[in-house]
């Protein structure tokens, strides 16, 4: 990937990366992103679920939504994903920070127009969300597919940024505690379930995701 003025990280550039392998790792760990776009000079940021493969990130929504009009017009958008890893508590409040990994993707949306393309997206997305779910749920019918718009953005313009490690101390006061509080996302047991018996693919998903660090 060629780094340009848009993708280049300027603040703490030593934390930046343009390695696609790291981008895909962050995307694989996440479920939601924030999409920034502009309508007649007014900026908006919308949280959305996503699916990705090695080449594209996919977004979907109601055909009635304002953001879908922007997508369909082919206007440029940016997509951000944040993975928090810990709270960094320094001796001086001004030096407090967070450990994180983040990615920002730039591009123009392309619409998936046929039912076959949409159905393929839905099938891949649901098994990416919870592996094994596709075989344990009903795929959308003709009317349901008409009620969703699907777009993709190529993963060829992006930047990744990561902070890790301990505090960057300026103050040396020995009586003040400093350190990092690690932060992890954990999945709990299902609620509002249609049955008291939890399917094996759901159990495996919870166990696998909770084993990630």
Labelled PLM ranges:
Residues 36, 51, 60, 80-82, ...:
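Residues in well-ordered beta-strands of folded domains
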Residues 42, 50-58, 63-65, 76, ...:
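Short, charged/polar surface micro-motifs in flexible loops or helix N-caps
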Residues 3-58:
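An N-terminal domain-cap segment
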Residues 34-38, 91-93, 109-114, 134-141:
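Short helix-to-loop capping/linker segments positioned immediately adjacent to catalytic or ligand/cofactor-binding
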Residues 1-3, 12-16, 20, 24-25, ...:
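Anion-coordinating catalytic cores for phosphoryl-, nucleotidyl-, and glycosidic chemistry
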Residues 1-4, 117-213:
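C-terminal edge-of-domain segments
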Residues 31-33, 46, 53-55, 73-77, ...:
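A generic structural signal for short beta-strands and their flanking turns/coil linkers
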Residues 64-124:
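Short, structured beta-strand-loop surface elements
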């Amino acid at each position: 990937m060629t780094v340009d003025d848009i993708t280049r990280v300027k603040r703490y550039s030593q934390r930046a990366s343009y390695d696609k392998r790291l981008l895909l790792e962050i995307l694989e760990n996440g479920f939601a992103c924030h999409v920034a776009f502009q309508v007649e000079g007014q900026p908006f940021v919308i949280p959305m679920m996503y699916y990705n493969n090695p080449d594209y990130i996919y977004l979907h929504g109601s055909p009635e939504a304002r953001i879908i009009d922007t997508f369909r017009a082919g206007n440029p958008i940016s997509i951000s994903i944040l993975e928090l890893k810990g709270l960094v508590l320094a001796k001086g409040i001004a030096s407090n920070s967070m450990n994180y990994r983040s990615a920002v993707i730039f591009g123009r949306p392309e619409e998936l127009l046929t039912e076959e393309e949409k159905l393929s997206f839905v099938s891949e997305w649901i098994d990416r969300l919870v592996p094994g779910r596709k075989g344990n749920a009903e795929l959308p019918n003709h009317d349901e597919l008409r009620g969703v718009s699907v777009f993709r953005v190529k993963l060829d313009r992006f930047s990744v940024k990561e902070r890790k490690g301990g505090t960057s101390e300026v103050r040396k006061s020995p009586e003040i505690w400093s350190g990092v509080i690690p932060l992890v996302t954990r999945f709990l047991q299902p609620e509002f379930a249609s049955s008291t018996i939890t399917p094996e693919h759901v159990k495996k998903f919870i166990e696998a995701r909770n084993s990630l660090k």
